[in-house]
From Swiss-Prot:
It comes from the Bacteria. Homodimer. Probably interacts with PlsY. Its main location: cytoplasm. Keywords: Cytoplasm, Lipid biosynthesis, Lipid metabolism, Phospholipid biosynthesis, Phospholipid metabolism, Transferase. It is an enzyme of class 2 (transferase). InterPro entries: FA_synthesis, Phospholipid_synth_PlsX-like. One of its GO terms (biological process) is phospholipid biosynthetic process. One of its GO terms (cellular component) is cytoplasm. Disulfide bonds: none annotated. It comes from Ruthia magnifica subsp. Calyptogena magnifica. This is Phosphate acyltransferase.
Length: 339
């Protein structure tokens, strides 16, 4: 089966200079991948001519879009006034079933607003949530919501847990993913009333809920899926990225202090390279907008080529696993059971 993915080529901080190169790499990696590059046609052609041989000429299509959603643009304006933006056109391709998934590094708020308007949410899901991977001591875990909803009720958090569990099950091939609820402590008496109510609902569900997890558990790999409100999730995500940058800064300072430390750094280069790779946020780039009638993956706006490739890979994996369809089917079964 050919997997077709639309790329918002003009989106993000670097636009076509990154998205096209990443797309070419993706075509080289995945032999059953077909891409739709959406954006200014002449600019896309010029960039493709710089890097692309005729090897992949039959595996991509360029679709012209005359507008771009700016990174600081109001989601409402992007939705109402920029109907020919590269983001909107790329998402429309998911709606018309021309592609299996869409990837964009554009404005998160605009991407969520346009995706909800064009694709609509799955029946039984009130609001979509953003799910991404976080590095751990033993690999990675998944976490949602990472910023789509900043004041979620317990019922919404249960929806997030259900969607996340289904997605992780099929992405990671885990029969029954373990789920933890992010809290300020593991004890039952800790946390807000909202968190306590959510915990009660999770315990009563059919999900594999194991209890509260704290901030440090995110990186221990205690569970397969961490559920939280988008406010806390986004802070945790950005804090972890900041810590990685700080660690890199201090390591560089330590190893360039004098001739001896530079020699130590030279000897330790393979170890440091592996260390940097395991913590590189770009390696985990590509967050899913779960709950939509279609697959949309959000890339970091500042993604480089390899980071954007990771986002395309995430879309490719989700499309192969038919994540949106699996979520829709499971939610439909639960609705029928509750009637």
């Amino acid at each position: 089966m050919t997997i077709k993915v639309s790329i918002d080529a003009s989106g993000g901080d670097y636009g076509i200079s990154v998205t096209i190169k990443a797309g070419i790499k993706a075509l080289d990696v995945f032999q059953d991948l077909y891409l739709y590059f959406v954006g200014d046609e002449s600019s896309i052609k010029a960039e493709l001519n710089k890097h692309l041989s005729n090897t992949f000429s039959s595996r991509y299509t360029i679709i012209h879009a005359s507008e771009v959603v700016l990174m600081n643009e109001s989601p409402a304006i992007a939705l109402r006034k920029k109907k020919d933006s590269s983001m909107r056109v790329a998402i429309n391709l998911v709606k018309t079933l021309k592609v299996n998934a869409c990837v964009s590094a554009g404005n998160t708020g605009a991407l969520m607003a346009i995706s909800r308007f064009v694709l609509r949410t799955i029946k039984g899901i009130d609001r979509p949530a953003i799910m991404g991977r976080m590095p751990t001591m033993i690999g990675h875990t998944h976490m949602l919501d990472l910023g789509a909803n900043v004041d979620s009720k317990p019922e919404a958090l249960i929806e997030f847990a259900t969607m996340g569990s289904i997605a992780v099950k099929h992405i990671e091939n885990i029969v029954s993913p373990t789920i933890g609820l992010l809290n300020i402590g593991e004890e039952d008496m800790k946390g807000s009333e909202k968190i306590k109510k959510t915990a009660e609902l999770l315990k009563a569900s059919n999900l594999n809920y194991v209890g509260f997890v704290e901030g440090d558990d995110i990186y221990k790999g205690t569970v397969n899926l961490i559920v939280c409100d988008g406010f806390e999730g986004n802070i945790a995500l950005k804090a972890s990225e900041g810590v990685v940058l700080m660690m890199g800064y201090y390591l560089k300072q330590a190893f360039t202090r004098n001739l001896l430390t530079k020699l130590v750094a030279l000897i330790a280069t393979p170890v440091l390279r592996d260390f940097k790779s395991s913590l590189n946020p770009g390696k985990y780039n590509g967050a899913s907008l779960l709950g939509l009638q279609g697959i949309v993956v959000k890339s970091h706006g500042s993604a480089n080529v390899d980071s954007f490739l990771a986002a395309i890979t995430e879309a490719y994996v989700e499309a192969h696993a038919k994540i949106s369809d699996k979520i829709s089917l499971q939610i439909s079964k639960e609705l029928e059971h509750n009637e």
